């Protein structure tokens, strides 16, 4: 019984992952949708964060810093990604202005215990209104990732445990598409849970019926 209770816990208590609402990142004219949730039936409230950057026309790639967080032991009380605290930590560590830190992705990539944040940092002389930003408008993402890896205090950012810090040109998809195998597994799991409680209910009703019949047969 305890096993099934554990399985149902993520459905009852809100946590960062999995996301049940569309995620909006940044503020002002740079506010954009950085993650689309399949659970949220509401229209996407802001433009895609893809509109902020001049991605490669053929591959859709763009150089970013990618930070992967392990949520297993550090996100129990959080219902959403603490963007302000993240931005504050990055800006103070790298000595850049907070408003120059542009978050492009906040994604659970189909997991309950991993959060991926992808971001870029504007150069000081970049006009933040001149969209989309080209690679030349940004501080080199690879050098940022290298500097962050060398900073021991960045093993935790915004009270979240950091798993990896990497330079990449592959942006995480705005909307995670689960594989057919994953969908089948979840369907089977739900069917097993439903079947267990159904059989348990029938057994209890049958047991009560037998006890009632025994009482009637008593002199």
From Swiss-Prot:
Gene Ontology annotations for the cellular component aspect, listed alphabetically: membrane
Key words of the record: Glycoprotein, Membrane, Signal, Transmembrane, Transmembrane helix
Transmembrane segment boundaries: 183-203
Signal peptide extent: 1-14
Annotated compartments: Membrane
Membrane topology (Cytoplasmic): 204-219
Membrane topology category: Single-pass type I membrane protein
Extracellular compartment residues: 15-182
Keyword Signal: yes
Glycosylation sites: 72, 127
Name the UniProt record assigns to this protein: Uncharacterized protein F13C5.5
Species per Swiss-Prot/TrEMBL record: Caenorhabditis elegans
